[in-house]
A protein has these predicted regions:
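Hydrophobic/aromatic beta-strand patches that form the interior of the parallel beta-sheet core
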Residues: 1, 18, 49-52, 149, ...
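Structured loops at beta-to-helix junctions and adjacent beta-edge loops in soluble globular domains
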Residues: 52-57, 125, 241-244
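Conserved RecA-like P-loop NTPase helicase motor core
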Residues: 148-259
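Conserved C-terminal RecA-like helicase domain
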Residues: 70-185
Length: 260
C-alpha cells in the first residue's frame, strides 16, 4: 500500500480514479465460491484484518492530551539517562496486556494468544523510547520469552530498511513456528517491506492527528499472506490503545475511498 495515491487524489477527477480496497477484496473473497463454483479463490490467502481497541486513557487518566486522547509521547517519555520517567505505569501496561480477562481478551493473556501472536510489530514514538522499552520487555516475566528486535534507529530510512529487515528475518529464523519475536520500530519497516510471519501490530505511537495514509500503511504490514508449517494465516490483528484515534483514521479512510 503506497501513500502516494492518497496524496494525488485531489489532482484527478472521479472518472480517472479506480479504487480496489481492502473491503472490496474481502467481499470478493467471501463471494468467490458462490460466483465461481469449483474455481480456485485468488483471494483465499489474503487474511482478514481485525482491529481491537483498548482505552488506556480510562485506566491511565494522567496521560490524556488536550483533546482527551491518550498521549503516547508523554507516556513513553525518557530522561537524560534513557530511562522511562513513567516506568511504573509502563510496567503496569505490560502486565495488563498479559492479564487473563475474559471480558477484555488482552492479546498476550493466554498461551493460545501468545502462540498466535508469536511474531508482532510494535510502533513507538521514537528511538530512545524503543531502546528503553526493549530493556523492560527483556526483563518481563512474559515478554522475556520473546526475542526483542529493536529496528528503531537514526539515519537514512531507505539505506537501513534492508538491514532492519534482515535483523527481523534472522530473529524469526527458518522455523517461525518455533520462535517468538517482538519487533520495535518508530518508522522503519512501515513501507515497502513485508514480514509474512507478523500476525499483529501494536499502535503505541502517534496522536489524534495521525494521518490516515501513514496509519493504514503501517497496519497493513501484518496482512501479508503466509503459510507457516502448513497453516494458512487467515487472520491478522491491529491493537490500538487510543480508540478515538482509530475511529478518526477509519472515518478519514472511508472518505478517501468514497471519493475515489
Amino acid at each position: 500500500l503506497s501513500g502516494t495515491p492518497f496524496n494525488l487524489l485531489n489532482e484527478y477527477g472521479e472518472d480517472e480514479i479506480y479504487t480496489w480496497d481492502y473491503v472490496m477484496e474481502q467481499d470478493a473473497k467471501g463471494k468467490w465460491d458462490t460466483a465461481h463454483p469449483g474455481d480456485p479463490n485468488p483471494y483465499a490467502a489474503l487474511p482478514e484484518m481485525r482491529i481491537y481497541t483498548f482505552d488506556l486513557a480510562k485506566m491511565l487518566d494522567a496521560f490524556k492530551d488536550e483533546v482527551l486522547a491518550f498521549n503516547f509521547t508523554e507516556f513513553f517519555r525518557v530522561d537524560t539517562e534513557g530511562k522511562f520517567i513513567h516506568e511504573k505505569d509502563i510496567k503496569y501496561f505490560l502486565d495488563l496486556i498479559c492479564k487473563p480477562d475474559p471480558e477484555s481478551n488482552y492479546p498476550f493473556a493466554t498461551k493460545k494468544f501468545r502462540r498466535y501472536f508469536r511474531h508482532s510489530f510494535w510502533m513507538l514514538p521514537g528511538v530512545r523510547e524503543a531502546r528503553a522499552l526493549s530493556a523492560l520487555l527483556q526483563s518481563h516475566k512474559v515478554f522475556g520469552q520473546f526475542q526483542i528486535v529493536n529496528v528503531a534507529g537514526e539515519g537514512d530510512e531507505d539505506a537501513e530498511n534492508e538491514e532492519a529487515l534482515q535483523m527481523v528475518r534472522r530473529a524469526i529464523g527458518e522455523h517461525p513456528e518455533e520462535t517468538y519475536t517482538i519487533t520495535l520500530s518508530c518508522r522503519r519497516l512501515t513501507t515497502g517491506v513485508s514480514i509474512p510471519e507478523w500476525t499483529a501490530v501494536f499502535m503505541l505511537s502517534g496522536s489524534h492527528n495521525t494521518s490516515a495514509a501513514s496509519y493504514m500503511q503501517t497496519i497493513f504490514r501484518v496482512q501479508t499472506p503466509a503459510t507457516i508449517n502448513g497453516r494458512v494465516k487467515t487472520l491478522c490483528f491491529v491493537f490500538d490503545f487510543a480508540p478515538d484515534r482509530t475511529l478518526k483514521v477509519l472515518a478519514e479512510t472511508a472518505k478517501i475511498s468514497a471519493k475515489a
